[in-house]
């Protein structure tokens, strides 16, 4: 009986041991199965479409390796990086965006501020240029001590002359006046004296004193500087001989060559500031200005002429001067100039749409000043443009065909040449 109990106990213990072994084995099997299932269900390895050089993204390669253009490794382009090709935008991993240090800015509406300094030069005012002549034949009795470059005031004596024609006409006047000549005859003689060049003050003296004058003084008709004076005492003088040339000094002209691209900004005298190196602390008042009608064919500039007050004669003809232009454009859309990609053939920017995609857009830049560009078309107020990190995004847009979709929005994906190009065989020709 005791041996029977021992036999039953041994069977029970053996059964328990066998059950435990089966349980452990089953648990290990199930655990290992659970671990292998995810491994088997892992996503397949990304498919590489081609390799490219980020510095020249329009060329594709069929193998990895060194770029033939730059000393750098080619970068793979994966199939799942192309994004939604039905739209013009591309997606970039947020981590990469952060690493690139991308900065964006809203498109605003405002006016471009211009502040440009242009070299200029001082010249005589040609409206204040006179030629002094006797207008009758005679000879020089006296030359006053003057020469080229001397300043003269209006009424300053230049020369004393004797002119027989004037003496003869005076005699005729006195004869008609004393013998009952008609008013018309007397008036005609006086008018002949004026046309012959006799100074008006000498004519009035003749009428008041009734005395013939034989010596006359030619005087300066304006304030200015003598620019021609070549007479000597005792010289004969003909009626077409120049006694003197005198240039006025107040006001003077200041001329500057202004780029024709900013001619539309010239509005009124308040936008001009004049300075000269000789008197850096002086300011000068611009009375009026005008743009000359022709454009310099070589420099493509317009000639701007300003009439500047010069009462103290600080401004000397021939001086260097500087014309500072301070003005504003009309209101337009504005973006930072660094946001513009200008290839010479097209101008574009990278915008960010509501979904966070980067979308290239063609634009037309009207004007640029002080790192701001005025936009004529392609953007709307409130759009977001990328202002830094442009290069890599633009390269990505080129690779994914976004630029082609921008240029040819009517084409389908299959007809886009940028996406249908075959990768270059890195080993061809070897």
Swiss-Prot record:
One of its GO terms (cellular component) is outer membrane-bounded periplasmic space. One of its GO terms (biological process) is copper ion export. Belongs to the membrane fusion protein (MFP) (TC 8.A.1) family. GO terms for molecular function: antiporter activity; transition metal ion binding. This is Putative membrane fusion protein SilB. The gene is silB. It comes from Salmonella typhimurium. Residues 414-430 have a biased composition (Polar residues). InterPro entries: CusB_D23, HMBD, MFP_Cation_Efflux, RND_pump_MFP. Component of the sil cation efflux system that confers resistance to silver. May be part of a three-component cation/proton antiporter. The lineage of its organism: Bacteria, Pseudomonadati, Pseudomonadota, Gammaproteobacteria, Enterobacterales. PANTHER family: CATION EFFLUX SYSTEM PROTEIN CUSB.
